Amino acid sequence: MRSILRATFAIAVAMLAIGFQPTTVSAQSVSTFLGGSGTTSTTQQSWTTAGNWNTATVPTGTAVWAQINSSTSPILRILYTSTSVGSGTSLTVGAISFLPTLAVSSGSTYAIQNNSAGTKGTLKFYGIDTTIDGTARRIILDNQTSLSDVNFTQTLAGQDFELYSSGVINVAAGTQLTLTPLIRDGSGSRTVTKIGRGVLSLAGSSTSSTYAGGFSLEGGIVQWASSGVSGTNPFGSGPLTLRSGTLRSTTTTGKSINSNVVLDGSVTLGSTDPSFNGNITVNSSSGSLATTIASNSIVTIAGGSTAWNQSTSGTGSLTLAGSGQVRFTSLSTLAHTGSTVVQAGTLNMQGNMTSASAVSVFNAATLLGTGTISGATSILSGGTFSPGAQGGATGVFTFGSGGLSLAGQSLMEVAGVTRGTQYDGVDISGPLGYGGSLLLQFSGTLADNTALELFKGFSSQSGLFSSITVAGSYTGSLAESSGVWTGVFGAQTMTFTNSTGNLVVVPEPAVVGLLGGVGMVVTVAGLRRRRASMQLASRKRAVEV
């Protein structure tokens, strides 16, 4: 038998249900529903038929406790929307299975619990289209007892949760709801929304769900045990909309999102909890999946690293926060027209940001990478800019006509003389504003008469670094005069010039002339040769006279 989850699929873990029972049983009368076979006629299944009750009277009133027994099966099935319960306050059952609908006619609170003797049985919700007073409501699983985890498990082959309308899963704080059956559409294209501060854990067959309307995270935590593939994964074949809450792995193993993503609020990816800190990857499925920034959104990377392979679009702004790293890979083209703010953590840009929107890197945040940003980019005071990949790999970062404004710390690494592969470089087609500090980290010394193009191509330059410091194979700082920074390190002189963006190393003592190009270095030895030649020519003329 296929168990079907019809209806609004609104399962809420928060306010009432499992575990509540009247404390003064003796003050209530008990009526037992017999219900015949429960399979042959609506008369035998009706709660409003007096003959179906052992008292031959339909129980009503607040002093009545309706106890339900099944004479032919250990599972009672309430089958029809026409069934109703009076104003009783408790249904006591061993194991109960709701197929399509449970309807109650009063505004009372109903507690559905397992009250069997000895080892407790199983409480099963197979279909939950709950109607109270003619209005669709939610069945709520209460955390008022010792219950902390609620598990909906797949016990028979072919059991699925089938959606006949869209709805909400509400999991209260301190509670975890685990779903293992596959979730699929029963008719139409249905959506599932997660609210509440508790944990929804998707495991088993639920990680291969196929419902097409999409999954919306609007509160609490959602974690998943297996990532699936595009079209068959924990979030179905529709978009994953992130409005509020946290997405994390069920373990320390990384997990992937294989759905189109809609950013529409504030969401956290990953976790600082060592039990759930697996990295999150947002996959593109060979470019078929993309991210829409529907409104001004905040993505917090709680820890670790999130690789974002999807391209972006939309009019919203994107703010990155948290201690972790977001890496927009070479698979991603960022075309959203709202601004991008790195409020905390690290933005590792390997992709191409084609929109003209501004990028800002705040205090204690970092921008690194070898990608391209077209819009105006500002490294604010306290922020860090480091071209190249994290961990010492060098590279070239490219900025478009929007230019680059530096007011924080710029860190560039030098391990040789080949631009991009051995030392960091910055290409800029727009204006360059110097500011903040520049730290040059050397791995090895440079040969005499070497010139490095640190900053290249800018349309104009302005401002000054507050300091230029060298570390590693060279140690010390450079002093500035009229836009030229100079430092002496052993037998070499190192010079950085604002107007060219070049770093030049020559022997000491030396006179350095940069005649508009790299490598146009005139040393003292050259001057001496020319001076000697001039003296020789003068002596020759004197002899001839």
Describe the function of each predicted region:
Residues 4-5, 16-68, 271, 409, ...:
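Extracellular/surface-exposed low-complexity segments
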Residues 1-12, 23, 510, 527-531:
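Bacterial N-terminal signal peptides that target proteins for export
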Residues 523-545:
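C-terminal membrane-anchoring or membrane-association module
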Residues 508-527:
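A short, hydrophobic C-terminal helix/tail in secreted or cell-surface proteins
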Residues 70-94, 237-245, 251-260, 355, ...:
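N-terminal extracellular ligand-recognition/capping segment immediately after the signal peptide
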Residues 29-61, 120, 144-237, 269-363, ...:
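Extracellular repeat-rich scaffold modules on cell surfaces
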Residues 58-78, 99, 348, 386, ...:
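Glycine-rich repeat segments that build the extracellular carbohydrate-interaction surface of secreted
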Residues 45, 275, 363-459:
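Extracellular beta-strand/loop-rich repeat segments of large surface/secreted proteins
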